Amino acid sequence: MMKSIQLCILLWCLRAVCCHSCELTNITISVEKEECRFCISINTTWCEGYCYTRDLVYKDPARPNTQKVCTFKELVYETIRLPGCARHSDSLYTYPVATECHCGKCDSDSTDCTVRGLGPSYCSFGEMKE
């Protein structure tokens, strides 16, 4: 009886690891432009999931400890025209779309690597247009 419970727990853990690996997922983000003074929601794809990582107890200064995160491997950019902007303003908005994901080091030059970023639904204007 105890062995079958342990086996079930082991299989459940293996399922959690393999089924929630780093992969593409659909998300909704808020986009805004200063000239338009409002936000709209758009759908795109981004990377989500778990990556195997470890934090060493004894730190070795000669070997940097890099945590792996689920991040994009390939990106394309799409452009939309924001509706309802002022007549002479630039209403084009370009946003990233992930096309391939992997577990790797977070690139702070192109990604918000903070623990608590603003989040994809943040709108600085406080007004969302449908």
UniProtKB/Swiss-Prot annotation:
Disulfide bonds listed in the record: C22-C70, C36-C85, C39-C123, C47-C101, C51-C103, C106-C113
Keyword Secreted: yes
Gene Ontology CC: one annotated term: follicle-stimulating hormone complex
Localization of this protein: Secreted
Keywords recorded for this protein, A-Z: Disulfide bond, Glycoprotein, Hormone, Secreted, Signal
Function (record text): Together with the alpha chain CGA constitutes follitropin, the follicle-stimulating hormone, and provides its biological specificity to the hormone heterodimer. Binds FSHR, a G protein-coupled receptor, on target cells to activate downstream signaling pathways. Follitropin is involved in follicle development and spermatogenesis in reproductive organs.
Stated name of the protein: Follitropin subunit beta
UniProt source species: Rattus norvegicus
